[in-house]
Swiss-Prot record:
May be involved in environmental stress response. Zn(2+) 2 binds at residues 101, 104, 122, 125. One of its GO terms (molecular function) is ubiquitin-protein transferase activity. This is Zinc finger A20 and AN1 domain-containing stress-associated protein 5.
């Protein structure tokens, strides 16, 4: 009677593995089960630690930028320089905010169509022939075909 059948042995092994596994709790003592992939923290505490770590990095970076600016201001005289790139960036922001058709100035809201020339149009002016589009579709198509289908040259065969 000291021998056990295979079925009984497997049942005991399964029960042993179930009882030996222990659940670890969160390292922040919030009472939720922890995940080893998140440094033995629950998901909520792990996300909170990531946010606080990212905020610390941003704050230290902004302090460095502020100190660098103050050093530059002290060492050089104040000059006001307006760069054309900054002006273009401001104009692009203004264009993105306005939701009006560039052809008829009609409000388009969320139904506007953005053309490849960069303008926003209503349903009547969305096609390139309706708004005198400055984008060259033929050249862009040729370049795309040339990029996607490179010329393949085979090695020459040596005749014997």
């Amino acid at each position: 009677m000291a021998q056990r059948t295979e079925k009984e042995e497997t049942e005991f092994k399964v029960l042993e593995t179930l009882t030996t596994t222990t659940t670890t709790l969160c390292t922040n003592n919030c009472g939720v089960t922890a995940n080893p992939a998140t440094n033995n923290m629950c998901q909520k505490c792990f996300n909170a630690s990531l946010v606080s770590a990212a905020a610390g990095v941003v704050e230290s970076g902004s302090i460095l930028k502020r100190s660098a600016r103050s050093v530059n201001l002290r060492s050089s005289p104040a000059k006001v320089v307006i760069r054309p790139r900054e002006i273009d960036a401001v104009k692009k922001r203004d264009q993105q905010i306005v939701n009006r058709c560039s052809g008829c100035r009609k409000k388009v809201g969320l139904t506007g169509f953005r053309c490849r020339c960069g303008e926003l149009f209503c349903s009547e002016h969305r096609y390139s022939d309706r708004h005198d589009c400055s984008y060259d579709y033929k050249t862009a198509g040729r370049e795309a075909i040339a990029r996607e289908n490179p010329v393949v040259k085979a090695a020459k065969m040596v005749k014997v």
